[in-house]
Amino acid sequence: MASSAASSVRPPRPKKEPQALIIPKNAAEEQKLKLERLMKNPDKAVPIPEKMSEWAPRPPPEFVRDVMGSSAGAGSGEFHVYRHLRRREYQRQDYMDAMAEKQKLEAEFQKRLERNKIAAEEQTAKRRKKRQKLKEKKLLAKKMKLEQKKQSEASSETQEQPSSGSEEASGTEDEEEDAPSFITGR
């Protein structure tokens, strides 16, 4: 039994160092303190609250049994019941109007977004077409330059080959020019 008593006794926990009480003076200091507390133990899971659902009024009752107004003849407590029903109905109508307005604004936003997207696509297509045109123009200019270079090389080759033979031919032409043109025997 002594062994069970010894095993049930836990070792004493180490004493935590006392922390100074810091009172935040503004929202930034409060946020800083919260972050410091979270970062002391990064392994601990952080509770992230869910997004609160939007408030919606209760649906109207299926059947209203006691239809009454604020007219004379109603009991002293009936006016308060009527007032609460009226307030609830006005809240429901305001909610429906707000939701309709929100849906209308969302639809307008989506239309505007679609128009902007189409305009951006058109502008991009226009610029793409312009870039392609410039690219083709540069490619065509490059081809023309290569063709001119080939033609100039070919013409220089043709000029070099006949130029050696042209000197001999030019000598014979000079002789022909010296001879009278009326002789046709050659």
Swiss-Prot record:
Region of interest called Interaction with EIF2AK2, as start-end residue ranges on this chain: 1-50
Swiss-Prot/TrEMBL keywords: Coiled coil, mRNA processing, mRNA splicing, Nucleus, Spliceosome
Single GO cellular component term: spliceosomal complex
InterPro entries per the UniProt record, alphabetical: Prkrip1
Main subcellular location: nucleus
Annotated Basic residues bias: 126-143
Residue span of region Disordered: 39-61, 119-186
Superkingdom classification of source: Eukaryota
Subunit architecture: Component of the pre-catalytic and post-catalytic spliceosome complexes. Interacts with EIF2AK2.
Family under the similarity heading: Belongs to the PRKRIP1 family.
Listed Polar residues bias regions: 153-162
Function: Required for pre-mRNA splicing as component of the spliceosome. Binds double-stranded RNA. Inhibits EIF2AK2 kinase activity.
Coiled-coil regions listed in the entry: 86-153
Required for nuclear localization: annotated span: 126-138
UniProt subcellular location: Nucleus; Nucleus, Nucleolus
GO biological process, one term: mRNA processing
Segments of this protein annotated with the region Required for RNA-binding: 51-143
One Gene Ontology MF term: protein kinase binding
Listed name of the protein: PRKR-interacting protein 1
Compositional bias of kind Acidic residues: 170-179
